[in-house]
UniProtKB/Swiss-Prot annotation:
Transmembrane segments: none annotated. SUPFAM superfamilies: P-loop containing nucleoside triphosphate hydrolases. It comes from the Eukaryota. Heteropentamer of various rfc subunits that forms a complex (RFC) with PCNA in the presence of ATP. This is Replication factor C subunit 4. GO terms for biological process: DNA repair; DNA replication; DNA-templated DNA replication. It comes from Caenorhabditis elegans. The gene is rfc-4. The elongation of primed DNA templates by DNA polymerase delta and epsilon requires the action of the accessory proteins PCNA and activator 1. This subunit may be involved in the elongation of the multiprimed DNA template. The keyword ATP-binding applies. Belongs to the activator 1 small subunits family. One of its GO terms (molecular function) is ATP hydrolysis activity. Pfam families: AAA, RCF1-5-like_lid.
Length: 334
């Protein structure tokens, strides 16, 4: 008979960097002053409404909700008072009936502290992924249990929520984080982890992540072993995932005057230096920023970008698709 395998319970818990460096208090939340001021007011005893946090991904919506709840409730009653759900995992009406409603009906856990708010909080992340039927059921729960329960709803697209849910919440838009704040946060993580990266490389990671700080931190963690190994070839190869800024600038400047052979040569350079999707997006964005594309052609160019991206992601030849993109781009803006 085989002996049971021993389990090492003393092994340290391994956390992803997004969890390890998630803001622990409201003061750690960056660039969302309006939301932080309101939540600090609730900590000091002001009325707490149902809340709706919306805005781009990676801007601190979930972190702000969790940091607020950690400061609001002592650790010994935190799990009795806070329910954290991700609606994208369970989109239907069952999650409302089985989890949200049952938690709302449960009695408040006892606390010896007089200053602890006599409420429960339900954090519902990615609520815009819920079906309309589930949202309607949730609206009834919000109404029925408003004396004992507050909801913090989190989504990227507020337009996907039904009006009766939106009207019952105080809305707060989370702004996109400026580049300097993202680079500063990434630099703090690099220093703490002993990961050598220049500011230019951090900017490349940030550009690749398209303003999503959570995605940037995940990218940084996956890149860390390569950086620590000292393998410059692997380092440069990985960082090509965020397109070369100088190359994109050269393409945008020469696209109007270049002939077909020159565009073919540019395409070969792009294929060697960049990922196709990242290049197409950043090239389009730069031309928009420089007002090269007029209002009449924005729709045409948007369709071109989407078509080329889909072809590349579906596995079509990268060089041919980039050539098609550049030639069509030149024809459109001339």
């Amino acid at each position: 008979m085989e002996e049971p395998m021993e389990v090492d319970n003393k092994r340290p818990k391994v956390l992803t960097w997004t969890e390890k460096y998630r803001p622990k208090t409201l003061d750690d939340i960056a660039y969302q002053d309006e939301v932080v001021t309101m939540l600090k007011g609730a900590l000091q005893g002001r009325d707490l409404p149902h809340l709706l946090f919306y805005g781009p991904p990676g801007t601190g919506k979930t972190s702000a909700a969790l940091a607020f709840c950690r400061q609001l409730f002592p650790k010994n009653i935190f799990h009795d008072r806070v329910l954290d759900l991700n609606a994208s995992d369970e989109r239907g009406i069952a999650v409302v009936r089985q989890k949200i409603q049952s938690f709302s009906k449960s009695s408040l856990g006892h606390s010896h502290r007089e200053d602890v708010l006599k409420l429960k909080i339900i954090i519902l992340d990615e609520v815009d992924a819920m079906t309309r039927e589930a949202q309607a059921a949730m609206r009834r729960v919000i109404e029925d249990f408003s004396k004992t329960t507050r909801f913090i709803l989190i989504c990227n697209y507020v337009s996907r929520l039904i009006p009766p849910v939106v009207s019952r919440c105080a809305k707060f838009r989370f702004k996109s984080l400026p580049a300097e704040i993202q680079v500063q946060r990434l630099r703090t993580i690099c220093d703490a982890e002993g990961t050598p990266m220049s500011d230019d490389e951090l900017k490349q990671v940030m550009e690749y992540s398209e303003g999503d700080l959570r995605r940037a931190v995940c990218t940084l963690q996956s890149l860390a072993p390569i950086l620590k190994s000292g393998d410059d070839n692997a380092r440069n190869c990985y960082l090509r995932g965020s397109s070369d800024s100088l190359l994109i600038s050269n393409v945008c400047k020469s696209i109007l005057t270049a002939d077909v052979p020159q565009i073919i040569a540019l395409t070969k350079d792009i294929t060697k230096s960049c990922t196709g999707v990242a290049f197409i997006r950043r090239c389009f964005q730069q031309l928009m920023d420089e007002d090269v594309i007029n209002d009449e052609n924005i729709g045409v160019m948007g369709k071109l970008v989407a078509t080329c991206e889909k072809r590349i992601l579906d596995g079509c030849d990268l060089e041919n698709n980039l050539l098609d993109f550049l030639l069509t781009l030149r024809e459109t803006i001339q």
